[in-house]
C-alpha cells in the first residue's frame, strides 16, 4: 500500500485559515491573548485582489497571526469595501460551514479568563473527556467559535 508521501500531490501544507471580522483590532487583541503572535498586517487592494476574490474595488486589511510553534497561521481580514455580506455568526455550533477553530492550550481555565476579558463567552461549559482532555467552546469576536483543548493524560 503506498504511503501518503508516495503519491503525486499538489498540496504542500495547509497555509492558513482565513477569518473575516468586523473589527480587526479587537480580533487581533483576542487572538493575542490566546497566545498567537502578530506576524504582519497590511492593506490589500488592487487588480490582483479583485481578480482573486471576484470582488470589484475591494479594500481589506489583513493581519496574519501565527501559533507559538510557528506551524499554523490565522489570517484575520476586515473588509472596508465592499461592505461585509451577511452574518451567520450567531448560528449554533452545528450550522453548516466552517464553525470553529480549535487550539491546544496548557491551562484551559487561565485561557478562558484571559479571553473573557476580551468579550469571549462560554458556549457550554468546560467538559472532561475521560481523563485525557478538558474541552470547551467559546464565542469570540463576531461570534467566531473557538474551541480549547487541554491535554490531561496519555492519548493511548
Model regions: which residues?
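Residues within well-ordered beta-strands of beta-sheet-rich folds
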Residues: 18-20, 102-104
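A generic structural micro-feature
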Residues: 11, 54-59, 92-95
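Vicinal oxygen chelate
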Residues: 2-10, 41-43, 64, 72-77, ...
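Eukaryotic phosphotyrosine signaling hubs
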Residues: 14-16, 96-100
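Short acidic (Asp/Glu) patches
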Residues: 59, 84-86
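Core segments of cupin and vicinal oxygen chelate
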Residues: 20-71, 117, 136-139
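Short beta-strand-to-loop junctions in surface cap/lid or active-site-entrance loops
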Residues: 22, 77-81
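Terminal, regulation- and interaction-focused segments at domain boundaries
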Residues: 8, 13-15, 19
Amino acid at each position: 500500500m503506498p504511503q501518503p508521501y508516495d503519491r503525486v500531490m499538489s498540496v504542500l501544507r495547509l497555509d492558513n485559515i482565513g477569518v473575516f471580522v468586523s473589527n480587526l483590532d479587537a480580533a487581533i487583541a483576542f487572538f493575542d491573548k490566546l497566545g498567537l503572535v502578530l506576524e504582519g498586517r497590511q492593506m490589500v487592494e488592487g487588480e490582483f485582489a479583485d481578480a482573486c476574490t471576484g470582488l470589484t474595488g475591494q479594500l481589506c486589511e489583513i493581519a496574519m497571526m501565527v501559533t507559538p510553534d510557528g506551524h499554523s497561521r490565522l489570517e484575520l481580514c476586515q473588509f472596508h469595501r465592499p461592505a461585509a455580506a451577511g452574518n451567520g455568526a450567531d448560528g449554533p455550533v452545528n450550522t453548516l460551514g466552517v464553525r470553529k477553530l480549535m487550539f491546544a492550550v496548557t491551562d484551559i481555565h487561565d485561557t478562558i479568563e484571559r479571553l473573557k476579558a476580551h468579550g469571549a463567552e462560554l458556549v457550554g461549559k468546560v467538559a472532561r473527556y475521560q481523563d485525557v482532555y478538558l474541552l470547551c467552546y467559546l464565542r469570540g469576536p463576531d461570534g467566531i467559535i473557538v474551541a480549547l483543548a487541554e491535554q490531561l493524560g496519555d492519548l493511548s
